[in-house]
Every structure is written in structure tokens, then in C-alpha cells.
């Protein structure tokens, strides 16, 4: 094997080595960072924006519930035309006899006010249930934001990983192509056999296949990145794990997750809503007290030119005695639903616990894999250098060299994959703990506050326009 072949091959192999460190290298001035990509997703992702709209819609249930405290005012107006013909049954010559007719236009208007004074605390409990629903929807929004940010971090690291692997695979094609050319030259001078050439040709075909597969994988990762982040990836800066948000041990992670995860809080609010619904249904069995007032003005009611003004105030007490059993059935149903919500809350706690333990295990495994892959690269490089030197003096075959190169390639791919897995696992752990939010990550965004919209609508009596929540 001549010196020219050795130098060119070493240059190609060294170029492949630089791809290994693409996940940990320095970022260019114009490169997109992981934090800036997540900021894009936070502001533009349709899943997050849809959930924000859902929270705003849930806010409106509070003023709806409060309407039970407020009066119901209705205005009425009517107008008609009447024709009356009266035959007295006596001759027209007799006083008051004959037939008389009357044409009137009766009309009038009025206002009625109904005010509930006591409804078995149903309105009070409806307001409390609506407020709990609002709090639950906010926690669901937090869960959605966390999921999108995790998806964004995963998509970002997948593009970095697949770009680096594609670079390795393309470089591997160049290395093997150069080796095939040199093997053919050696075959022409009788240094190797036709078998050596065939082995190099087969390995080149396999390398091209792997490069094509790596390119397809990268395209898929780019598509996912576009879906989550909202733009196509350009130059991406290296991603780094969230070590500053990672606790020292799994027990600390579990303590945080079980106390803070928004999915658990959302289920707890759902339990509150279900328990209040039981009280709402039971309230239908309580006496109902209300007062009604009305004012009416009538014209031409009995004869042309007459008018009448009337006003009334009526207090009404209704005591339910038996309503067919519907309220009792609805109350039992609400109790069963409350039990279901408690079980669902327990299930979510178990899911959070399992997610934390699983994410912690993946993070520990990724750290170990990085160390193992680095050691594997060192050993594979040493082995390749030795095999190449032995091949110079005829003690190794072309296949031995190809195998050693493949081992080194595999080690580099393993390191890239492990680097990606460590970053994603750290984000997964923080997500499982319930702390993967825009503020904890320090994203440079306008942080969305659902309380602003809530304060704008919670006490509105009238109005059709929708506040923007800003």
C-alpha cells in the first residue's frame, strides 16, 4: 500500500472524526440554538395556541355560573287588531237594541325582573366548579407546553444527530471508494487478488446504501422539526443537557414530580369539579326562593282610548316533594363520576412516577454509553492503525482493513447517538418532573399568562367582544 493512499485515506478519516463532535462543538454566530428553536415553538406551535384558546373558552364558564346571582330582565311588547260584533236580539228601534260593532287596536309593553334569592347553593357551587375547571385547564396548558417543548428539543437533537451521521456515512463512502481505487491498482500489479477487489466493491455498495438510508432519516427528522418548531432547520448550534435542572438522585426527582407536575394538578382540579357537581345535583332537592317584579302598560284593551298601568311584586317559595327520581339518579351518577376522577388522579400519579424513573434510567444509560463509545473509538482507531500497518507488509487482507474501518464508523455513530440521547433524556426527565417550562428554560419570549384573560372576563355582565388576554 503506497504512501499516497495512506495520506489521502487519513485525511478522509480525520474529516469523519470532526462529525463525531458536532453535538458538543462551538456554535457559529448565526447558528440557531436549541433555546431559540424552543422559543419559536413556544410562540408559534398550533397545539400550544389551541390549548390557550381552550383555556380562554373555559374562563367564560365563570361568568356563566355567576349569572345565577344576577337578575333576569325581559321586556315585552305586543300589538293586535280586534273586531267585535254584538247583536242584542232586540229591534234596532228599541234603546240599546240592534247590532253594534267595535274595532280596536290593543297594544302594550312591559318589563319583568326575576331574581333568585336561594337555590340550594347551586349557583355558589357552580361558580366554585367553574373556577376549578379554569385552574385545571391552566394546568392542562402547562402540560401541553411541556410536551411541545420536549418534542421541540427531541426534533432539534434528531436533526443534529442525523446530520452528523449522514456526514459520517458520506465520508465513509469516500474512504471506501478511495480504497477500492487503490485496491484495483494493487490488483493490476498483482499485489492482491480479485477477491480483494470484490470485497471492496461490496463494501462500497453497502456504504452507499447506508448513506442513502441516513439521508432519508435526516429528511424525516427535518419534517418533524418543521412541524414542531414551525420553520425548516438551518445551521444548528450544539445542544446541551439540562444539568442545571436535573436533581442529584431519582428520589429528589420523584419528590418534585409528584408535588409539581401539572398533569397531577389538573386531575386534582377535576376531582374538585366532580365533587362540587355532587353538591350541585343535591341542591335541586332544596327549597327554591325567588322574587319577581313586573310593570305593564296597556292601551285600547276593552274600548278605544282606555289605558291601564299595572305593577306587581311576587315572592315565590318552591319546595320540591317528588320529581320522579331524576335528581336522585343524577346525584348518584355524580358520585360515581367523582370516584372515577379520583382513580384517574391516582393513575396519573403512577404515570408520572414511572416516567421519572424511566427518564432517569435513560439519562444514566446515555452517560455510560458516551463513556463507552469514546473508549470504543479510541480502541477502534488503534486497531485500524495496526491493521493498516500490518496490511502494508501483507499480514492483513483488504477485508481486515474494511472491517476495522467499519468498527470505527460504528463507534463514531454510537457516540453521536449517545450524545443525542443524553440531551433528550435530560429534557425528558425535567418534563417528567413537571418543570420543562419557558421560564425554567430561560426562553426569551413573552410568557403567556392565562390570568390576564380570566381577570378581563370573570365579572363581565354584558359584552360580545372577546378580550385578547394581553
Name each region found by the language model:
Residues 50-65, 144, 148-168, 178, ...:
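Amphipathic alpha-helical coiled-coil segments
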Residues 2-8, 83, 417-470:
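Acidic, low-complexity, intrinsically disordered peripheral segments
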Residues 33-36, 106-108, 154, 199, ...:
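Transmembrane beta-barrel architecture of outer-membrane proteins
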Residues 29-78, 84, 116, 233-272, ...:
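Bacterial Sec-pathway N-terminal export signals of envelope proteins
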Residues 1-30:
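Gram-negative bacterial Sec-dependent N-terminal signal peptides
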Residues 2-11, 147-258, 362, 366, ...:
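Periplasmic alpha-helical coiled-coil/stalk elements that build and connect Gram-negative outer-membrane
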Residues 49, 72-92, 99-104, 114-143, ...:
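Small/polar (Gly/Ser/Thr/Ala-rich) solvent-exposed segments
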